Structure formats: C-alpha cells, structure tokens
From Swiss-Prot:
Protein's gene: rpmE
Entry annotated with the keyword Secreted: no
Classification via InterPro entries: Ribosomal_bL28/bL31-like_sf, Ribosomal_bL31, Ribosomal_bL31_A, Ribosomal_bL31_sf
Similarity comment text for this entry: Belongs to the bacterial ribosomal protein bL31 family. Type A subfamily.
UniProt record, GO biological process: translation
Species per Swiss-Prot/TrEMBL record: Bradyrhizobium sp. (strain BTAi1 / ATCC BAA-1182)
GO molecular function, one term: structural constituent of ribosome
Key word Lipid biosynthesis present: no
Function per UniProt: Binds the 23S rRNA.
Protein name: Large ribosomal subunit protein bL31
Length: 75
C-alpha cells in the first residue's frame, strides 16, 4: 500500500436541524469541527412522510421554483 494517500480521519460533531449533536468520525473538516445540517432524517419529507417546508438557505429553493414555475402545468 502507498503511504500518505488516505485523507485524515478524525472526530467531528454533527449538529442536526433540531439542535441535537452527536460525534462521529469523518474526513470532512478538521478535528473538532462542527457540521451543521440544513436537512436531516428528522426534517426531510422522504423520512417524515409529510410535506414539511424545506429551509431555503441561500435562496436555492426559491430560485429553482422561479426557474421551473409552471413547467408541469397542463394548459
């Protein structure tokens, strides 16, 4: 095996949308960094079975909706 080709694997803290935190090991960020989730299994409609509102961070959802407004409408 080649040496020094694998990324650093360390402990980070994941913050869920409801504020709960847990620690896991990851290659993301640096040791001790916090990863704040925009959407997670507790808030995603695919896992909750509902039509919850998706938080629009950075305006991505509204830009998408504006771009494809009326795309599937039947005349």
């Amino acid at each position: 095996m080649k040496a020094d080709i694998h990324p650093n694997y360390h402990t980070i803290t994941v913050v869920m949308t409801d504020g709960t935190e847990y620690q896991t090991r990851s290659t993301w960020g640096k040791e001790g960094d916090k990863l704040n989730l925009d959407i997670d299994p507790k808030s995603h409609p695919a896992w909750t079975g509902g039509t919850q509102q998706i938080m629009d961070r950075g305006g991505r959802v509204s830009r998408f909706q504006k771009k494809f407004q009326g795309f599937l409408k039947k005349d």
